[in-house]
């Protein structure tokens, strides 16, 4: 996905910073990572508070196979399909990702 498309997707927050990351891109807002782009897909950050909403909307959690062959779940979820058709829906999911990033930053400072 082109950086301009990513900027548009996250415009509800304001300008985001996009950095290369592990063959994809890390998407940051005010210094906190809120999403990743990998293989053309943007995955939004979620946590124990917001993950149930992503799951209920049919989003998929990013997972990869670890060294032991067991799935390792990452704190990133696909964007629910309705968000691509409705800008208000996209704004809601983007805000949830930012809220999760803020909670993660707060927890790491403790």
Give residue ranges: language-model regions.
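Charge-dense, helix-prone N-terminal extensions
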Residues: 1-110
